[in-house]
Amino acid sequence: MKLFLLAAAAFSAPALTVSELNHIKSLNPRWKAGIPKRFEGLTKDEISSLLMPVSFLKNAKGAAPRGTFTDKDDVPESFDFREEYPHCIPEVVDQGGCGSCWAFSSVATFGDRRCVAGLDKKPVKYSPQYVVSCDHGDMACNGGWLPNVWKFLTKTGTTTDECVPYKSGSTTLRGTCPTKCADGSSKVHLATATSYKDYGLDIPAMMKALSTSGPLQVAFLVHSDFMYYESGVYQHTYGYMEGGHAVEMVGYGTDDDGVDYWIIKNSWGPDWGEDGYFRMIRGINDCSIEEQAYAGFFDE
């Protein structure tokens, strides 16, 4: 009975600890570590539910048309999509207890690039739930492949979040692919991409793609120290690999110490990181952040 109680206590114990935080701080990372409000009291399983198995990142190489530019010389030194297109980017959202980061980041990239292209009369928040429920080439709350979801967004597309709001964060289930809006008022109307490209591992091309046509969907390997991120330019410092995560890259820059970084929008809500965003070191493929960089295109 005593062993059972000890095991139960360990299972329900908070995943982030002061002792591990202090160890990370002792390594003097260039970024600020803490226990984010988003993760206070959460168990290891609850935090792990936000991630995907690493296999979703490793099995995707060479799975999409390559993106490149003949001229990469006129790339600006810095770019922040939030500043250049403040009317486009919606609020930071929270994927909840579902490993649907692949859907959130692809749909966010899809919507923001449509906004840059001027295809919507007003900025539209598109539905990650429709993608989770209807894209059977991916695994709903258990993860997804970036090339697969972009194939889905070109062949099928997605609808608005108003029509099909997000539920899987609380249910942790795929749900049924809807044919009507949640309120039953109208048939689901779908917007699609015409094509997609992968700019991964070509940093100048990634920078030019960001500054000329909008955000990119990227993915990286998450280590335990990343869960303690609060601010600054993250670089992996300590800990085991916990899984994979897909996010929306929205810009790049250089800090006061001359460290190049990417600006990235997460899907863990505004109580994590720099108001829901984080910066990650640029140019060394830290945690494989530069291996995949997907962009959708629209010829409407």
Swiss-Prot record:
Disulfide bond annotation, renumbered to this chain: C88-C115, C98-C141, C134-C177
The record's InterPro entries line, in alphabetical order, gives: Papain-like_cys_pep_sf (IPR038765), Pept_asp_AS (IPR025661), Pept_cys_AS (IPR000169), Pept_his_AS (IPR025660), Peptidase_C1A (IPR013128), Peptidase_C1A_C (IPR000668)
Q: Which keywords belong to this entry?
A: Disulfide bond, Hydrolase, Protease, Signal, Thiol protease, Vacuole, Zymogen
Q: Which top class of enzyme applies to this chain? A: hydrolase
Please give the biological process terms from Gene Ontology that the record holds.
proteolysis
Instruction: Give a Pfam family name.
Output: Peptidase_C1
Record family assignment: Belongs to the peptidase C1 family.
**Which PANTHER family does its entry note?**
CYSTEINE PROTEASE FAMILY C1-RELATED
- Protein name, UniProt field: Cathepsin B-like CP2
